[in-house]
Structures are given as structure tokens and as C-alpha cells.
Amino acid sequence: MYFDTFYNIIKVAGELINETPLAIRTGTQAIGAIDNPIVRIKGVPYIPGSSLKGALRSEAERYARSIGEKICDIINPNGPDGELKLKEKRKEEYIPCIICRLFGGPTIFSRIKFYDMFPLNGIYKTSLIQRVSINRITEAQTPGRLFDVEFIEPGTRFDFRLEIENFKEEEEKEADILKFIVKHLIEGNISLGGMKSVGFGKIRLLKNTVNVKEYKLKNGELVENVITSSFLSGLLK
């Protein structure tokens, strides 16, 4: 549907900073008995692109519902509102929901690529904090239930990159959704990882570092295009 031909690629790059401790965890215990280690590649902590994609998709869904868009159930694609079930019922008339058209789903590829983000110039610090498990009934600590949480210290800068493929100016609602999630990132309204309820994971895209470029196909090669799109020029306003 959106990949039959090639139209353009929009590349957004910049720097992202964690304003509060960031703990995107592996879910397994690390060697050395850290209870909740953060994710790493070759020893370097990073922000998985999938983590940011999930957070932004949730925000995009909230926005889409607020403007009256019906959203597919991607958690249960065979359920009554699931994409696979809707496609089966509507057949040739089926069109994926606006969120699936941007972020992908069971029947369509994502048009947005989120890249893993690593600390700029390899500069970062990690720390441990000790927490205690609280009994929800007694509201008192549970004896013997201390645990350690590893996190990336606030102020770490990450290399941010995303790409949008085959985006056209006339897709006004899709453009509004993209502007909304980019604005949320710039305003620091997105949180990632664990312990968000106690303030962990707040991130911000630094507006003065953001660069937006559009590339189109010319003579078999990707060539940077002069930005005339009101969507692209207004993306950071």
C-alpha cells in the first residue's frame, strides 16, 4: 500500500537527553548480582529504538482517539477490533487504521524507523540505587525484600535518529500525529523504562540540535531535496 513505489525518505536527527534517571532493564539478573541491570550492547548502555517506538505509538494512539480515529487492537489482532479480524471481514475494502499506517501492524510494515540510541562520544555514568518492596496491604516494607536498580545518570546525551518513508504532504492527519509526538519529545513529555511512577525515565529531544532532511530518488540515487513541505518546515515549531 505504501511501499509499492518509492517517494521519499525524511530523516530526523538530533540529541536526546535523559532528564531523570533512566532504567531500561534487561529482565534478567546480571553477573555480579545486580537485581535489575540496564540493557547494554558490548557493555555500553543504550536506549532501544523499540522502547521509544512503543512509547510514541501509545501517545500517537491517544491523540488519534481524541480526534475521533478508530484504532486497531494490535495486542489481540484476531479480536473483534484486531487488524487481522478487520481485514478478514472487510476484504478488499480494508484499510489499516491511521496508527498502523504509520507505525506498522500485522498486515503492514512500519513507515517510521526508530534507531537504537547510544551515548554521544561514549560519555555516560551509571549508578545503583537500593529499593525496598512495599506490601500493598500493610503499606509497610516487606522484610528481606531489598533490591538494587541500575540506572543511567541524568544528563546523558544520546544520538537520536528516525526515518519516515513515503510521506506525502496531503496526509494531513498523519502529519498532525507526527508533529504531536515530536512536540511531546521536545517538551519532555515522554518517559521510558522502569520506575516511571517515581519519576524515572523522563527524556527530552533538544530542539536546537534537531536537523530534518528530505531525500528523493533521482537517476537511481537518493538526493537531498530542498524542503518546501509545510509539514517538514513546521515540524519543529
Report residues per predicted region.
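RNA-binding basic/glycine-rich loop and surface signature characteristic of RAMP-family CRISPR effectors
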Residues: M1-K237
